[in-house]
UniProtKB/Swiss-Prot annotation:
CDD domains named among the record's database cross-references: BACK_KLHL1 (cd18509), BTB_POZ_KLHL1 (cd18335)
Disordered: region residues: 25-54, 69-98, 157-184
GO cellular component: cytoplasm; cytoskeleton; dendrite; neuronal cell body
SMART domains reported for this sequence: BACK, BTB, Kelch
Protein's name in the database: Kelch-like protein 1
Intervals holding Kelch repeats: 463-509, 510-556, 558-603, 604-650, 652-703, 704-750
Low complexity bias (residue ranges): 25-36, 74-90
Name of the coding gene: Klhl1
Amino acid sequence: MSGSGRKDFDVKHILRLRWKLFSHPSPASSSPAGGSCLQQDSGGGSFEHWGPSQSRLLKNQEKGSVSAFWKKPSSSSSSSSSSSSSASSSPFNPLNGTLLPVATRLQQGAPGQGTQQPARTLFYVESLEEEVVTGMDFSGPEDKGLALKELQAEPASSIQATGEGCGHRLTSTNHSLTPQSDLDSSSSEEFYQAVHHAEQSFRKMENYLKQQQLCDVILIVGNRKIPAHRLVLSSVSDYFAAMFTSDVCEAKQEEIKMEGIDPNALWDLVQFAYTGCLELKEDTIENLLAAACLLQLPQVVEVCCHFLMKLLHPSNCLGIRAFADAQGCIELMKVAHSYTMENIMEVIRNQEFLLLPAEELHKLLASDDVNVPDEETIFHALMMWVKYDMQRRCSDLSMLLAFIRLPLLPPQILADLENHALFKNDLECQKLILEAMKYHLLPERRTLMQSPRTKPRKSTVGTLYAVGGMDNNKGATTIEKYDLRTNLWIQAGMMNGRRLQFGVAVIDDKLFVIGGRDGLKTLNTVECYNPKTKTWTVLPPMSTHRHGLGVTVLEGPIYAVGGHDGWSYLNTVERWDPQSQQWTYVASMSIARSTVGVAALNGKLYSVGGRDGSSCLSSMEYYDPHTNKWSMCAPMCKRRGGVGVATCDGFLYAVGGHDAPASNHCSRLLDYVERYDPKTDTWTMVAPLSMPRDAVGVCLLGDRLYAVGGYDGQTYLNTMESYDPQTNEWTQMASLNIGRAGACVVVIKQP
């Protein structure tokens, strides 16, 4: 290697070395300090040849590792510059009976100095698989990009080293001396891996491209010709790889015409194939993504999709969603669709919405996930779209109107539609309007009129709130809310203090927290929580302290039913008038009840189950506010305390709870669910819960019942399940953030 002053071995040089070593031996006594002959050690052992044996190299190649290579010291015109080696200083001295399998060289000081440089070894770092001799000092002179190191040998058993600039490691083990005859068959071998080889190679190919050298294909798109190298294009594009390696005509053509691709986008992607660099711009990103999809460049497709995700806005999300669908970019389409659903109120105010084709609009109208406050909003959006181009779009009106939940519109809107000019002469539209009017006029038949148009959209059903309850910390003070669209629970606020066995009602989208106990005493206090402002207001207290009471709203006022005052079970009932903000007593129940379930149905207040001090109850009675009287109903099939009660489609449901007979104080937790039909005054067993739940919170959200939390005998539950009356099945839903038993669950339409 000329850069280091050494000369590479050739065949003549090897023969000359053999001649010096074996054909013309010189006496040890005649060799001066600068003699040119190597001598054997005093032990009489033979030298190992310089460098690893051929068999060792082959063995290492089979293992996938590479041994070090060696170079002979440079020779001058006077071969006497080489130094003789003694047994004590020779680098070939055995280490525990073995020698390093690396080439060594003796470096002699300046003539006449008599000093000897330490033995050093040149090696190339390649394998990461084996152990090598340790205790060596490394230095790393660079030689025109070669990843070489110089190694100073010291006695040791193993070594690990990392080659400078390439991240590889030479590994080796100690080896015994090999026969001298190996020198005759061995050859000089080198193993090398360039640093940044691929980068440098592609940079050179880029230069060839710029100079239009060695180009073997020309891509023609429009009026533009783009030269390139087939190998480079095939290495990054599966499209070109298939083209150039298949038996198609393009595989042999020097000029290939590209159809359906933007010229600038193709140019950018060809440059990307050579450089790995790409500039993304808002005005060209769609052409670039379309070209990348065609040419099958997955890396480019991914970065373009992420770039478009960042550009999503109510004014362009519909276009991006349609474009992603056309290109088969599934992830981008999902993100754009979710963005559209979430921001639909802003989307319908933009030009893109008005320009939607009818096929795309019906997908929006049919979705349960559009984030609208009510069905009326969707209806007005449809009317706005139709009026934008009335002559062409009237023919699509009946098809699109079928995706509007007309039965859920206010009756006054339906009355106006019947004589509207757009619908008056359309028979299909008239049928849809009549169906919706029947739904309002015949509420008792609604269970027979169920259809996709009677199912409310997720965002219109309101938000489910879970307030307080017993947890592992002896009383939860957090308020969580559940969003049906996202199927997630999040914390919505905090209570003013700890309350257990209290009641909650909703008036004007505000939570009224009533009674309960704080762990020491039974409460009669009342507080009002505003979810919008997250503020609490103290209201006048009840006349009676109550925990384990039932609370509900009936025709405006709030009713607080039964409970326990700390001394006895109660049958008294109080009513809160929102106008006068006063509590007054109404008629008392027939039976004292605590841990009672209450619900309003068909203008009556139902009081279900509970405990009377001796056992759990199966009885139920109802209160008529117009007569101020309580009347008994048919009893439940099961006795239940801590029962959850809610109404759905004209039926009353009793869910979970516990049964503790008077003769046995051990409670039996229940997973039974019963349904009461007020028309026939009968109870019917329906599908049970997935697990027993005592002190379970139950309410109606949309068209389903939700059972939240509870106690299973060992754990305060954070699970929730929903009941579909149409299929008579319970389904697991998202879990609360903490387990709660006795939590009050209510729905607020507009949180």
